[in-house]
Amino acid sequence: MVKEFKEFISRGNMMDLAVGVIIGAAFTAIVNSLVKDLINPLIGLFIGKIDLSNLKFTIGEATFKYGSFLNAVINFLIIALVVFFLIKLVNKITPKKEVEEDPAPTNEEIYLRQIRDLLQEKNK
């Protein structure tokens, strides 16, 4: 069972997935810092509040923390944009597969088609 697990985990796809998850986690930390430490203060300068995550409004007993939601939206948009550009780059670098044309029909296929056509004409 241990041997099977080693074979499973060392296959190419699993290793690619593991590397992707690790890099994704590190990238998320970078994007979070970018949004929190650079983008939010810039937006805060325009709206008069430096810390967007504390933006909220209250209706009765309910408090709506829309600042945290704005942070999450900004994080998502940045990550989506970077993933979009990475996919475009990979598609540009990866060689395109050529579409295989159907091979020419063999003599046998030609004869069978002729027989089929003759039988169809005869049965009309």
Curated annotation (Swiss-Prot):
Assigned keywords, A-Z: Cell membrane, Ion channel, Ion transport, Membrane, Transmembrane, Transmembrane helix, Transport
Domain of life (superkingdom): Bacteria
Compartments it resides in: Cell membrane
Keyword Lyase (UniProt): no
Alphabetized Pfam families for the sequence: MscL
Main location (coarse class): membrane
PANTHER family named among the record's database cross-references: LARGE-CONDUCTANCE MECHANOSENSITIVE CHANNEL, MECHANOSENSITIVE CHANNEL MSCL
Family membership noted in the UniProt record: Belongs to the MscL family.
Subunit structure: Homopentamer.
Function field: Channel that opens in response to stretch forces in the membrane lipid bilayer. May participate in the regulation of osmotic pressure changes within the cell.
Protein name in the entry: Large-conductance mechanosensitive channel
